[in-house]
């Protein structure tokens, strides 16, 4: 019995500094027969992201839609017929091909699984556990309150995940920062908590950290994605600012 075909899908916008190393690592898995397809969706980059990815060994699809991670991932899913899809972020500085093999192995270990999320340590300013500010201050508290079955997921906003094709074709991807937590909740609602697993990746995940002031949009879109799935109206920004 042959193993399911695995495709690695990487949405990338202006990630020329990191996309080459990531694609090079995954391309080795293609050569080894572990990965069947490697697709980078160049999300209207203004730098050399697409050219670098192609040179490193990826099949590059130029996004025909407006900018947005959800649109890019939908294009990636449509561009391959693989049974298993591995989504990766394009801004990771210390990427390892072990991300792909760990996610894939965990997904295939149980036929009931539909989604496997990555877990890792996220450093900030030299502190090993201080990264993931929106995760700890917004995403996890919201899940604990509104979807308590998902409260044990340590990295609900992780961009690295593996999922089955039937799941990818069943759900709609949010187009903003709510995409990761939206996919997590949608999987839970469609298939149940047992369809979701998490695998710890070795070491720290180092990527581009934004200043605190730039995280407002991220936090708001995560909040909107969770509230929409909980059947709760999104409050106006003025209400959020005024507080109780």
What are these regions (language model features)?
Residues 155-156:
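Activation loop
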């Amino acid at each position: 019995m042959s193993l399911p075909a695995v495709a690695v899908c990487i949405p990338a916008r202006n990630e020329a500094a990191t996309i080459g190393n990531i694609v090079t690592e995954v391309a080795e898995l293609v050569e080894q027969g572990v990965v069947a397809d490697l697709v980078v969706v160049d999300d209207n980059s203004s730098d050399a992201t697409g050219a670098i990815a192609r040179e490193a060994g990826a099949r590059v699809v130029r996004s025909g839609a407006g900018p947005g991670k959800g649109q890019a991932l939908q294009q990636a899913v449509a561009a391959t017929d693989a049974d298993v899809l591995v989504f990766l972020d394009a801004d990771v500085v210390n990427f390892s091909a072990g991300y792909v093999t760990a996610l894939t192995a965990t997904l295939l270990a149980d036929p009931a699984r539909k989604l496997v999320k990555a877990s890792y340590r996220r450093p900030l300013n030299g502190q090993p556990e201080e990264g993931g500010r929106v995760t700890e201050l917004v995403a996890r508290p919201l899940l604990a309150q509104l979807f308590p079955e998902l409260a044990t997921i340590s990295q609900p906003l992780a961009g690295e995940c593996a999922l089955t094709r039937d799941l990818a074709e069943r759900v709609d991807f949010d187009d903003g920062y709510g995409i990761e937590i939206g996919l997590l909740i949608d999987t839970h609602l469609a298939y149940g908590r047992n369809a979701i697993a998490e695998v710890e990746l070795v070491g720290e995940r180092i990527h581009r950290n934004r200043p605190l002031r730039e995280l407002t949009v991220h936090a708001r879109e995560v909040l909107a994605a969770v509230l929409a799935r909980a059947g709760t109206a999104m409050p106006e920004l003025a209400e959020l600012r005024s507080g109780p």
